[in-house]
Each structure stands twice: as C-alpha cells, then as structure tokens.
Design a protein with these regions (language model features):
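C-terminal substrate-binding subdomain of Rossmann-fold SDR/epimerase-dehydratase oxidoreductases
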Residues: 13-155
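Flexible, glycine-rich beta-alpha linker
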Residues: 1-11, 34
Length: 155
C-alpha cells in the first residue's frame, strides 16, 4: 500500500525521501516485482467494511486492481519529482523478494460493496510526495538509520 505516515523503509517512501535528500533512489533486482498498490485510505475503508459488514469466518482479500511493477512506480515518482526517469541505481535483489503479489478482491466488492476511491495512482502518488515534502520532521530522523541498514545489506 502507499500513503502518508508510511515508514521510510518501505518502497515508495524510500524512493521519495531519497530524492528529497538529493540521493539517487535504489531499485532491487530487475525492478519487475509487481504489487497491487492501494492507497492507505482505501485499505482502511476496506478493513472497516469487513469489520462492520463482513461475515464471521469468511476471508476477504483487499486489493485495488492497481498492479504495477516497481520500476514503473519508481519512474513515475522520478517524473513527478522532476527527475530523469533513469536517475536511480540498481542494487542486488533482496533474498526471497516476492516477484508478484496478486490479489483478487472481487468477493470484497461483490459481497460488501466496497470499491477504492483513489483510482488515479499518479494523483495519489503526487499527494504522497507532497505529504513527505511537508512532513520532513516526521521522517528525517529515521531516514539515516534506515539507509545505514540497507547499505550494510548491500542494498
């Protein structure tokens, strides 16, 4: 997922905050890992729908049909932040890094009437970039420790 208040160790905030600090973002492996990106507000609304309208004992998967590769997301971030789309460094992949997270949220939509409100990923990403720009005091102290840990792992 993506949204405000996400720790700087996570993919999207790590890329955004690296660019804000004048550093080149890092991309694991080939960058072809795919995630179903869902805004945190939509995720929270889905959890609430399950808690208040879901049937006890049922399993509901939460997804927003937002599948996109990491390299596509990073290039979008770079573009939105006025950087060349190749202004990043490749790093070795994490051990056990999942290639794709596939989510079928059709049951959640059909049975509980939930659907995502944040369907324009670029617009949502722009808002997240703005949030991190306005809340540097929230993330800056965690950034160096996070990057030091990644450097120690060669990432």
């Amino acid at each position: 997922n993506y949204g405000p208040y996400q720790h700087v160790e996570k993919f999207i905030p790590r890329q955004i905050t690296s660019i804000m600090e004048g550093a080149r973002p890092k991309l694991y492996g080939t960058g072809e890992n795919v995630r179903d990106w869902i805004h945190t507000e939509d995720h929270s609304r889905a959890v609430w729908a399950i808690l208040t309208r879901g049937r006890i004992g049922e399993t509901y998967l939460i997804g927003a049909d937002g599948e996109m590769s990491n390299i596509t997301v990073l290039r979008m971030i770079l573009q939105l932040m006025g950087q060349p789309e190749d202004a990043f460094d490749w790093v070795r992949d994490r051990p056990g890094h999942d290639r794709r997270y596939a989510i079928d949220a059709s049951k959640l939509r059909a049975e509980l009437g939930w659907s995502p409100m944040h369907t324009d990923f670029a617009s949502g990403l722009r808002n997240v970039i703005d949030w991190y720009a306005e809340h540097r005091d929230w993330w800056a102290s965690a950034k160096e420790a996070t990057e030091a840990r990644y450097r120690a792992q060669g990432q």
